[in-house]
Amino acid sequence: MAYQNNGGNFRGPRHSFNGQPSGRGNFQRHDPEEDFKSKLTSLIVRIGDKATSSLESNIDALANALLADIPKQSSLIQDILFKCVSSLTYKTPIYATLVGLINVKNSEFGKEVVCRLVDEIFSAMEKKKFHNAKLLIRFIPELVNANVLTINAIFELYETLLSVLNTSDYTPNKADYFVFLVLSTIPWIGEHLSHNHSGQLDAVIEECESYIQSRSTGDKKFYQAYNNGYTDDRLESMLKQIKSLRDCDQPWIVNGILRPYKHFNETLTSSSSQQHILPTIHFPEDEKLEYPNNLNKPLFRVLSNDNNNSVERYIVEDYIIDILSFFNSDHKECSKFIYSLPVENEIDDIVVETILGEMFMLPEPTFKPIYYSVLFVDFFKSQPSVIPVFAYAINLLFENIHKLDFEVMDRFALAFAHHLSNFDYKWIWSDWAQSLVPPTAAAAAAAATTTVEGSTSNENKEDSTATTTAIIEDENQIRNRELRIIYIKRVLSSLCRLSYLEKIKQNLPSEYHQYLPPSPAPTFKFLNADNPEEESKELIAESHKLLLSFKTKEPLENIISHVANIPSHINIVELLTKCILQIGSTSFSHLTYAIERYITLFKTVLKSQDDRQECIRSIFEFWKLSHQHIVIVVDKFVTFKIIYPIDTVTWFMKPENIDRFITEPFTWECLHNSIQKTIIIIQTLTLDLEENQSQEKEFKLNTSISEQQLLLAELVKGLGSILSSEKYQLGASSKLLISGQLKSIIRKYFNQMKPVIQSQPQLSNIINQYTQ
């Protein structure tokens, strides 16, 4: 194979297609067959890495090279080709043109590709590889452009996809996805269809528009990450973009989509006998198949762009989202590939906004938030033009923190902390410090005086109205300032977790020190008789005995016997919990070892819900200077079934704990951890029951489901009670935070909440009242 690809260095993952590690130091004997496969893969994968003037000549040369190998390697070539088509997002036109050129001289190969394409689409759908399925569907219009398929193929495709709207059993997510597939192909085929089939194309667009307008959008606000007035979801945005493309001065001319087939137009259209009929496409009929649920959620828009209704915006954003998906295991290659896209305009604003949008997606991002955060670190090192755009977006979000969903605000804080930790904590801290300062008392006093001196004259009435407006604005400013402080505290707390307190202090301006958490240290009050609470000598002596028995590793039976004989007036639960935490305070591995070693002792002592509540109280008191330790310790105690998931809900909903803890981030970490534990338990028991049916296993599963439903019901009721009561010292920002966390719980655990709401309709009233 003499062909040399001059299209530039491949920016994709090195292991994606041939499975062979690259690099030196491999002294194994070469397999000629594997060498051939590797070279062939490299040629097909790398074609078009850089959209240079040599692209067309490279495609032509590769087509001629592959023609010689097709008689013996057709299956291998198709394997590689379809992996590329379904993964390398902007290269779809290149591979269609390649197939078109081969089809001119070997129509049997073209026919095989068309038949296999139908199978690949079904397989991708069945495996829920929806990004791959979209690109495979998009390959159809490109094959029409390359004269491999007849023009009827695209309308047969549209008819098949839109036929789902005429069935009675389709789900909203399925219908959204199929309409999305139709809209996502139009920019690639619109110009071709506009010549002789514009009426048919308009009919397709109108059918999509009719469906989009008929959809229920009542819960849109529930999933809005940033409430700045932009409410279009993906389908609504695409429809506007496509109609704008159709109705503009140069209709259907799209930048950002390669058109290599135009260079070969004469060759590709030399004979209509080489065109193939698209076989009927079938889709999986599995009712349990879960289609993407994010197409009806409001898009994230923070930067004021004039190009929101430009189809080029969608194309670049779609490329980026595909790349994020296909390269999620290699963030460095992902960041490189994004900036190798064949687009003429600067894309920094779209890159920043798209990745933030993916990170802030509700109810959950596609990948862990850290993935998106790491990409920004990569961009800062390799693409300096991103830096001012990123900084501008971060400042906008901080200034408008009240417009962020609370769950998103939390993700924003964690991501920003991670970013700062990678760049020596450098930021324009002085600018932010000003927005944390409260309004002056003088301004408030002046406003109050004006109100008191108001009269019945029109002029004074106007002054009074203006003053009232000013007071309202001040209240909003106070709320927004409090929200910024909550955000700053979350950022700084996360920074301390990623590093340590003293280092953060050294790198922060002094005005921020007041928002730092205290220095983490255990509080063990049994060390000596001079402790502030003046514990009895008897209690201190018992703690010393217990610690000594732990240190000398006395047999567990002896320790259990000793604890059983401790006088009843001594708080044994507190004593045991704090002594175990003391021996485990050196490190988290010490803690795990201590809990595992003495789990039987705990279960002997903790006999009731009151005992478990006392255990939690003791944990909070011991680690009152470290919220991170509280989260970890409580989670471990739940994991080892020393306390139950619902015990954390009961603890936080106690009146004496609400004012102290309910607005703290670690509270919600504990609650989410407890809910996740119930989900894991139910999943494990379900799998176990499926493998081996028994009444005992079924009983355990039903019991666990009931316990989970009780936990969720008590949590929603508790939060509703807090929000409706006036007895707690909660400001407006605190109530906003609690209602935001309630919304987060409903969103995140919607499937678990549904049966709870159905059995207890009063919960719907709480949810509707406090999450709108």
Curated annotation (Swiss-Prot):
A Pfam family per the record: MIF4G
Localization, UniProt: Nucleus
Keyword field: mRNA capping, mRNA processing, mRNA splicing, Nucleus, RNA-mediated gene silencing
Molecular-function GO terms, alphabetical: mRNA binding; RNA cap binding
Region (Disordered) location: 1-31
InterPro entries: ARM-type_fold (IPR016024), CBP80 (IPR027159), MIF4G-like_typ-1 (IPR015172), MIF4G-like_typ-2 (IPR015174), MIF4G-like_typ-3 (IPR003890)
Residues annotated as domain MIF4G: 37-249
Oligomer status and interactors: Component of the nuclear cap-binding complex (CBC), a heterodimer composed of ncbp1 and ncbp2 that interacts with m7GpppG-capped RNA.
Protein name, as recorded: Nuclear cap-binding protein subunit 1
Organism the protein comes from: Dictyostelium discoideum (Social amoeba)
Gene responsible for this protein: ncbp1
